[in-house]
């Protein structure tokens, strides 16, 4: 990262990182006189400065220069980019509150997960760092440890006991913090299938997320069969709180779902996917042909442009059939191209169009 390069370079040069800038994306054939000319104009707002050095970045095939500010400067007036040879040169600097902002974002993330910075150190069993020391720990170390937790191990990022499940009650009048049954069921199913923890612990975490009638049902099924698995509990929840529509109804509802007027194709596909998954759960549509059925329904039920229709037809004929996410990627790419085209059209000034028309008329005459 550019900020990391700035910090390391400042350490080597023995200068204050808070009073230094990196200018990146400079063409390699741009000499120091040219760089000085550009910076003299662009950095008038910072007062006096000096160019400390230039290095070559092989991966980008560009040059980077380090600039030291000689006066106390309000960093908010420093431009984030300057116009130089070859295009835009980016200006990188570190604001005094940058570390504080990182810690605030990290603490907010951990708070949502029911965790603390000290708890994360204990969970990672980081050697040489006491749980009492995290407030004094650098943001760089915290970022490293958080990434370490995401990369290593099969368990969740944080200790499972701190992972909050969504709330579900099954009540007719749901509280604001509650989730619909399908959303809650998705997370509960993930716990049942993927979390490497004992069945008793899984059932306890599921039970902690329940309120009202849903919690009553959990107590009933456990009383009937104390050794019941989480998966069997969830099957009972599907029977009581899940959709009651028949297999045939779910199939027909899916096949008769079309793109609505004014609805983007990507929004239609997302809406369609919910119905497809429900039909698969009801065994109205075989799971092994879900990708084929999805693609066929999109081609039949959406108002596709010629380019997108041809792309989807090619996928259908030549394969492999796209998954839901792969299909969404193709559709979003096409939508973005269309949006860019229409935006370009809307930017054309009426005078330009009239001028073009007059020029055509003069040619005809």
Swiss-Prot record:
Q: What keywords sit in the KW lines?
A: Acetylation, Nucleus
The answer to whether keyword Ion transport applies is: no
* Similarity remark: Belongs to the PNMA family.
Biased-composition ranges, Basic and acidic residues, are: 344-355
The record ties this protein, via InterPro entries, to: PNMA (IPR026523), PNMA_C (IPR048270), PNMA_N (IPR048271)
Tissue expression, as annotated, is: Expressed in the cerebrum, cerebellum and testis.
Q: Gene name?
A: Pnma2
A Pfam cross-reference name: PNMA_N
According to the record, the residues making up region (Disordered) are 336-365
Gene Ontology cellular component list? nucleolus
List the protein's name.
Paraneoplastic antigen Ma2 homolog
């Amino acid at each position: 990262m550019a900020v990391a390069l700035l910090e390391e370079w400042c350490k080597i040069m023995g200068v204050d990182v808070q009073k230094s800038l990196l200018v990146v994306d400079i063409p390699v054939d741009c000499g120091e006189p040219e760089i000085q000319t550009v910076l003299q104009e662009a950095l008038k707002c910072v007062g006096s400065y000096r160019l400390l050095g230039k290095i070559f970045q092989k991966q980008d095939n560009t040059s980077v220069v380090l600039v030291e500010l000689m006066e106390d400067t309000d960093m908010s007036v420093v431009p984030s980019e300057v116009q130089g040879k070859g295009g835009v040169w980016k200006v990188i600097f570190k604001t005094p509150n940058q570390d504080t902002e990182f810690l605030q974002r990290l603490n907010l993330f951990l708070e949502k997960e029911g965790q603390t910075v000290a708890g994360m150190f204990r969970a990672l069993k980081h050697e040489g760092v006491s749980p009492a020391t995290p407030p004094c720990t650098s943001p760089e170390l915290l970022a490293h440890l958080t990434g370490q937790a995401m990369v290593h191990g099969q368990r969740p990022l944080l200790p499972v006991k701190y992972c909050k499940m969504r709330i579900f009650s099954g009540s007719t009048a749901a509280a604001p913090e509650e989730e619909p049954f399908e959303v809650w069921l998705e997370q509960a199913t993930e716990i049942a299938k993927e979390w490497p923890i004992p069945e008793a612990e899984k059932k306890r975490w599921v039970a902690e997320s329940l309120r009202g009638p849903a919690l009553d049902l959990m107590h009933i099924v456990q009383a009937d069969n104390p050794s019941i698995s989480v998966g069997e509990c969830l099957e009972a929840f599907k029977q009581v709180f899940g959709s009651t529509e028949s297999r045939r109804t779910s199939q027909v509802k899916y096949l008769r779902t079309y793109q609505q007027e004014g609805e983007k194709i990507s929004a239609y596909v997302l809406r369609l996917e919910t119905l497809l998954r429900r039909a698969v759960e009801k065994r109205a549509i075989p799971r092994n042909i879900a990708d084929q059925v999805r693609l066929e329904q999109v081609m039949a039920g959406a108002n596709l442009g010629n380019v997108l229709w041809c792309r989807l037809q090619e996928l259908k004929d030549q394969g492999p059939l796209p998954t839901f996410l792969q299909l969404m990627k193709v559709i979003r790419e096409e939508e973005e191209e269309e949006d860019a085209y229409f935006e370009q059209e809307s930017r054309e000034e009426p005078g330009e169009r009239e001028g073009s028309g007059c020029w055509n008329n003069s040619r005809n005459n």
